């Protein structure tokens, strides 16, 4: 049991973290070529104009040490929206090992690809739940090559409601800057999903591409939550106030997108503490930093 698990000083759950096995970390570009994941490679292995990598590739030990430095009690490991169904299984098995080894610090979601078909996809979800994974995502139908009304995805989202498993979806702001690997994700699709599956809890990543600011209908859909992942790369610090003006704090969930370096102008290494400080300075309280995530996982 970690010495930090009962610490009253630790009041943060980071609900948007990615982690990979050592075989990927050793040579991410070569791994992506071998596994047929060019979109992930375009997003995650490139360098910025100054030559600094867009993200790091820590192992689980490095992640835990960064959590300790930042005062993060628990991290939610999100899967990636892989192009290959086999890669989803590979990451799910890895996450199962992580949460069994560190149940007091790590929570994990399962990722899936409906292109695998009905029985393989649902069978994988059953296996992932048996291994201790508690949510589904990060998914991106638009990046993975299937429709939001895909029959297998519909079954997945119905099962998520039955099992009370939250679903994290990648969202791109339609007005955001262009970057390598950027994929359009029409905001109307997320409204449709929330209305079609009212018992499924969806977390829309990256502030949901500003969905509740541009579509008042979304504000009334209580099964839509919004995480703050990669916030400094996309928006200014005023984003916190803009969201709190239209949504209650119970629908905003803190997430960093670690190990993405969200403050590249301040140094080459990804870390969690600066975004936590930004959130607190903007008035984010326990609801956003801790309690909302806990409620998602309460069945």
Protein language model features and the residues they cover:
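Active-site gating/metal-coordination segments in enzymes
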Residues: 73-175
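Short aromatic-enriched loop/helix-cap "lid" or pocket-rim segments at secondary-structure transitions
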Residues: 23-28, 89, 121-122, 180-182, ...
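Catalytic pocket-lining loop regions of alpha/beta-barrel enzymes
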Residues: 133-135, 145-253
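A general structural detector for well-ordered alpha-helical segments in enzyme core domains, enriched
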Residues: 62-66, 91-98, 124-128, 152-156, ...
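Active-site environment of divalent metal-dependent phosphoester hydrolases
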Residues: 20-23, 82-85, 115-117, 143-144, ...
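Short, flexible/disordered intra-domain loops and linkers
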Residues: 48-52, 84-89, 175-185, 262-270
């Amino acid at each position: 049991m970690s010495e930090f698990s009962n610490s009253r000083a630790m009041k943060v759950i980071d609900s948007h973290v990615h982690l990979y096995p050592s075989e990927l970390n050793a040579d991410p570009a070569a791994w992506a070529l071998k596994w047929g994941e060019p979109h992930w490679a375009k997003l995650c292995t490139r360098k910025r104009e100054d030559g600094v990598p867009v993200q790091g590739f820590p192992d689980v030990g490095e992640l835990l040490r960064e959590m300790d430095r930042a005062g993060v009690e628990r991290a939610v490991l999100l899967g990636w929206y892989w192009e290959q169904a086999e890669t989803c299984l590979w990451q799910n098995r890895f996450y199962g090992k992580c949460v069994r080894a560190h149940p007091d610090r790590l929570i994990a979601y399962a990722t899936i690809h409906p292109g695998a078909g009905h029985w393989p996809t649902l069978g994988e979800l059953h296996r992932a739940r048996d291994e201790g994974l508690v949510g589904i995502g990060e998914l991106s139908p638009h990046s993975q090559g299937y429709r939001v009304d895909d029959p297998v995805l519909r079954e997945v989202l119905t099962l998520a409601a039955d099992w009370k498993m939250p679903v994290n979806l990648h969202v791109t702001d339609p007005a955001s800057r262009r970057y390598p690997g950027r994929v359009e994700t029409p905001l109307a699709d997320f409204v449709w999903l929330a209305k079609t599956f009212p018992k499924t809890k969806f977390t829309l990543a990256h502030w949901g591409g500003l969905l509740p600011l541009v579509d008042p209908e979304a504000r009334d859909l209580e099964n839509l939550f919004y995480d703050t992942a990669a916030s400094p790369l996309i928006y200014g610090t005023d984003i916190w106030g803009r969201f709190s003006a239209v949504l209650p704090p119970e629908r905003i969930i803190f997430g960093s997108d670690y190990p993405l370096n969200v403050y590249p102008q301040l140094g080459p290494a990804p870390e969690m503490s600066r975004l936590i400080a930004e959130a607190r300075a903007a008035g984010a309280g326990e609801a956003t930093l801790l309690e909302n995530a806990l409620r998602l996982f309460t069945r």
